[in-house]
Design a protein with these regions (language model features):
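Conserved acidic residues
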Residues: 162-164, 277-279, 316
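Active-site metal-binding loops of divalent metal-dependent hydrolases
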Residues: 111-116, 168-170, 210-211, 254-255, ...
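Short hydrophobic/aromatic-rich beta-strand segments that constitute the beta-sheet cores
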Residues: 35, 84, 251, 456-459
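Extracellular low-complexity, Gly/Ser/Thr-rich intrinsically disordered linkers
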Residues: 247-248, 283-287, 431-471
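Generic beta-strand structural signal
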Residues: 111, 166, 243-244, 450, ...
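C-terminal cell-surface addressing/anchoring modules of secreted/extracellular proteins
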Residues: 487-495
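Extended active-site neighborhood of metal-dependent phosphoesterases/phosphodiesterases
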Residues: 73, 81-98, 133, 178-275, ...
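Divalent metal-dependent phosphoesterase catalytic cores across multiple superfamilies
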Residues: 1-207, 213-236, 260-271, 294-313
Length: 495
């Protein structure tokens, strides 16, 4: 049995629990379990909810059938301690676990990238004892680090984080690369992902990554409020959104690259929530990142199809993952494609430029093996492409500072690995659009604090609890400390 996962929607009035139960034998004979939730340890005013149960998948080797059980608990109040318990297969109930709702006024959330539990397994998927043992060892190690990251992040907030946002790739093994293309191979990895005790009481909003996208097993473990068919890749569902306090979070499944559908989804989500102060988009691919994937044509092509829609819908912040290295951009506006290229161009040049040579473990930044003065036609075309996707003209303010006031553009942030299961080197030529980046092969996490007029980001490494970047704040509105400025309208100011 896996631990419950909670998600939040609309000012803590709803909590969503997803329980995946391992049921032996015929699923038709298995009654849907119940969840009980009430106030305080004595579960005062307890409510009972019967799970919505659906068939999940079957382990063809053991004939173990799995079902997915999901519950929506309604009417929860902010700043209240609840306890919940759910029914097990034998009819008994779990020990009550605490779930404390938080404030929806000034609040904090944790942002992480690519836990990718199981990725430290270097063996390719095969139906062998060696593979399954290596996978088990990797899950153990990656889950330990994932647990450490979540605990440190929660401690950093004083236990007050309202939820976690994950930028995708919860697990490693895709269905395509599983032995026999089995849906079940990833189950041990989801068990590892859900194993930290803190997740009994910490809601998680997940994003679909490329390692999640081809296996419906993802959908059996997570709830996605206000889900849409728009952005669906036909396997794990489409885009979804939720609101928390003054913020609209729009979670895009960009494994479907149909930008028009994502545009339509965002317009619908905003129309349903027009008064939110902050608009945050989360997607997997690092469309403005700075590590190995960031210069790939398929990533930059996705950038130029999505960015105009983000800007037209007044998105404030875009949170991404995929590249297992931290980066934060300048405020950007108006990035657009200036040269034509296809998704599969420059593969050889990208590999050559990023090749770290004989000692890759000692490098955190690729060595730039293609010289700027190369006369090779393929190299010249590649370097011209890199220059075109630097987006120098999109930088709203190139000064480095801690606070940006009333920006017109968007901040893009890419999360490093949160488990240490895999890292990528930074590209050798830092893009013009990057304000700061970091890679030292240590897991990191970000704590984001939100108020009515500020959105503040701090990012930490887990080995020594130190920040890897300065505190960065977006501020909306003219505040007392800048009212004396001798301009009619304060915009794009950094101080």
């Amino acid at each position: 049995e896996n631990l419950p996962d909670f998600d939040t929607e609309s000012d803590e009035s709803r909590a969503i629990a997803a329980m995946v139960a391992d049921i032996l034998g015929a699923q038709a004979d298995t009654a849907a379990p119940k969840l009980i939730i009430g106030e305080g340890r004595n579960m005062k005013n307890a409510k009972v909810y019967v799970a919505e149960q659906t068939d999940a998948t079957t382990n063809t080797k053991t004939n173990e059938a799995y079902v997915s059980n999901k519950v929506i608990a309604t009417g929860l109040s902010a700043n209240t301690v609840y306890y919940y318990s759910y029914e097990k297969e034998d009819g008994t109930y779990t020990e009550p676990a605490e779930y404390a709702t938080k404030s929806t006024n000034n609040y904090s959330f944790i942002f992480v990238g690519d836990p990718q539990i199981g990725s430290s397994n270097e063996l390719k998927g095969s139906d062998t004892a060696e593979f399954y043992q290596a996978q088990s060892d990797a899950v153990r190690n990656d889950s330990f680090n994932w647990n450490t990251t979540l605990n440190e992040a929660m401690d950093k907030t004083g236990g007050n984080a309202s939820f976690v946002v994950s930028a995708g790739d919860q697990i490693q093994t895709t269905k395509k690369k599983s032995p026999g293309k089995s849906e079940m191979t990833s189950e041990i990895e989801y068990t590892g992902y859900l194993s930290p005790d803190v997740l009994k009481s910490l809601p998680v909003a997940t994003t679909v990554g490329n390692h999640d996208a081809d296996n419906a097993n993802y959908t059996y473990h997570f709830n996605t409020p206000n889900s849409s068919d728009l952005g669906s890749n036909g396997v794990v569902g489409g885009d979804y959104y939720f609101t928390y306090g003054n913020t609209l979070f729009m979670m895009l499944n960009t494994q479907d690259t149909n930008a028009a559908e994502h545009k339509q989804f965002m317009e619908q989500a905003i129309a349903a929530n027009p008064n939110c102060t902050w608009r945050v988009v989360t997607l997997h691919q690092d469309i403005y990142g700075s590590a190995e994937h960031s210069n790939e044509p398929e990533i930059t092509n996705l950038r130029y199809t999505l960015v105009p829609y983000f800007e037209a819908n007044d998105v404030d912040v875009v949170l991404t993952g995929h590249d297992h290295a931290y980066s934060r951009t300048h405020i950007l506006e108006g990035g657009h494609k200036t040269v034509e290229y296809t998704d599969d161009e420059f593969d050889a040049e990208l590999d050559k430029d990023m090749d770290a040579g004989e000692n890759p473990a000692t490098r955190y930044e690729a060595p730039a093996n293609i010289s700027a003065d190369s006369k090779e036609p393929a190299d010249v075309a590649y370097l011209n492409y890199l220059n075109a996707v630097m987006d120098k003209d999109a930088i709203e303010d190139t000064e480095k500072g801690e606070t940006v006031v009333n920006p017109d553009g968007i901040l893009y942030m890419t999360a490093n690995s949160s488990s240490g299961s895999k890292y990528y080197d930074l590209v050798p030529r830092m893009q013009s659009y990057i304000a700061n980046r970091w890679q030292e092969d240590v897991p990191t996490y970000s704590v984001i604090d939100v108020t009515d007029n500020t959105f503040t980001i701090n990012t930490y490494r887990t080995d020594n609890d130190q920040k890897i970047d300065e505190t960065f704040t977006i501020k909306k509105g003219v505040t007392e400390d800048i009212k004396s400025a001798s301009v009619g309208k304060v915009k794009n100011q950094i101080y």
